[in-house]
């Protein structure tokens, strides 16, 4: 089981390529998705742009995603404990000591894999371009 998590607001090619790489590491990819309230607490009151049920629907439609789990907490720690993935995937822009669930996964012999981030693809940059054009 491979697990990753995120907001995945305004799904873009960088997200898709990241998830494809994550899926290539195992037989099953489960994506933890921050609920709307969690996103607001983590990213501010103007986020997410796309509602959680729509973000979940888009993710679930991807061939590389086997399951989507929406979580209300600020971090996926509880879901990682429940799922017990063999591989935890995060973007390479995450400092190793800040990866939530790392201890849980490594304690049972699993591993954390950092996947390179696609340059030029981020929801923040998309939102910035939209704001500059309006």
Task: Place the predicted regions along the sequence by residue.
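Nucleotidyltransferase catalytic core that binds NTPs
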Residues: 1-134
């Amino acid at each position: 089981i491979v697990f990753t998590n995120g907001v995945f607001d305004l799904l873009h090619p960088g997200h898709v390529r990241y998830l494809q790489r994550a899926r290539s590491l195992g037989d099953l990819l489960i994506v933890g998705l921050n609920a709307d309230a969690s996103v607001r607490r983590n990213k501010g009151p103007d986020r997410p742009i796309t509602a959680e049920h729509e973000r979940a629907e888009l993710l679930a439609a991807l061939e590389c995603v086997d399951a989507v789990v929406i979580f209300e907490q600020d971090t996926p720690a509880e879901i990682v404990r429940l799922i017990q993935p063999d591989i935890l995937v995060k973007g390479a822009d995450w400092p190793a000591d800040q990866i939530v669930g790392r201890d849980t996964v490594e304690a049972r012999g699993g591993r954390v894999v950092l996947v390179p981030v696609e340059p030029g693809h981020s929801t923040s940059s998309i939102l910035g371009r939209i704001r500059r054009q309006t």
